[in-house]
Design a protein with these regions (language model features):
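The catalytic "switch" region of P-loop NTPases
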Residues: 1-31, 35-37
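Amphipathic alpha-helical "lid/sensor" segments that cap RecA-like P-loop NTPase cores
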Residues: 6, 27-80
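Repeat-unit-sized solenoid/scaffold elements
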Residues: 12, 41-61, 119-140
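C-terminal leucine-rich, beta-strand-based interaction scaffolds used for sensing/assembly
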Residues: 67-143
Length: 143
């Protein structure tokens, strides 16, 4: 069953971080970055916040920095990228460019259930933001 993500621009994700006292280590902008990179997936939000705190601790920072967040977002994105072949990456680039996604195709369903593509509504599908941040550029078309 695909994950229906919460829109990361809404306050729900921020309230989760606030309830978990995440803002004690995060600035407002850093919290917004974590919400954005999570794509609205609660599991990813919590993982990113926890991993950013660990990253900051290991680096000897007193609080989470934007670089800590970039590092853990890249790690999450790389995890989603792992195992994707050229065809799947082509599908993701097509989705990003056209905003069109056919859920009747088996390859597309696989991208949905593995959270590489997030469903915000029945007509709003997006590439997971952490994956998008590390995705290789599209192959140039041959002449």
């Amino acid at each position: 069953m695909p994950v229906v993500a919460a829109d990361p621009k809404r306050g729900h994700l921020r309230s989760v971080l606030e309830r978990r006292r995440g803002y004690e280590l995060l600035g407002d902008m850093d919290g917004d970055s974590i919400c954005r990179y999570s794509g609205g997936v609660l599991r990813d939000l919590i993982s990113l916040a926890r991993d950013a705190a660990v990253e900051a601790y290991i680096a000897g920072h007193d609080s989470v920095t934007s670089q800590d967040i970039e590092n853990v977002a890249q790690q999450l994105g790389t995890g989603y990228l792992r195992g994707l072949g050229p065809e799947e990456i082509k599908i993701l680039h097509h989705l990003e460019k056209s905003k069109s996604f056919d859920v009747s195709q088996a390859a597309n369903v696989e991208l949905l259930v593995t959270r590489r593509v997030l469903e915000y509504s029945s007509t709003d599908f997006r590439v997971h933001p952490a994956l998008l941040s590390v995705m290789p550029s599209p192959e140039p078309k041959s002449a």
